[in-house]
């Protein structure tokens, strides 16, 4: 409706209406659309100075700042683009806009990559690894940029600065994935040992990497977690999950015997759970 009303108004009247809307809607998520409408109307009137003033006034809006940064990048005005990005990062910190600072850092990274500024690329990748979400992307970039003889020390320091999630999402963990890539078996084992949430899923995903070095301890962890799970969980779906865990134990050294012992114990302990007995009949 707003678009229709504005489109049938003379330009001056349309600008007046937009100014009113900018005041009454200043806290709405689509405010930037009104700003762009005003800027376009001013440019149609060859009012470039007023258009630029409007843009500067609303640079605190993410969409407007991003639009201006993109224009500067197209014109290869990289230093000015970085200045706007740094301003945006400070605003994001002050206003606590989650994710916005990472957005600006990612654009800065692209500029530094385009201009072959290796030192700045490393600094931004490191910051995005420590504070951002897509950690494996920046881990992989950094591993190609840091000299091999410096990599272990660099990574150790960076990992200590990083706060990783205690949860294994769908059994997965960025921290664990990095230990796998680095073949750091001791730290992977320590992480699995300290996991208190979804430990079975974590073991199913990562234990096989440690079968040559930690099978005995992993079998003990599996057995303890599986006993606890069986004690607390009932129903066919949960029993089928137990049946998915057992082959993972089987792959470890000594796992075949461990599976036989677990199943034998369950057949005695849970003999009054017919659905479990049916699910375990093939073990």
Where are these regions (language model features)?
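Eukaryote-biased, non-catalytic alpha-solenoid scaffold regions
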Residues: 1-283
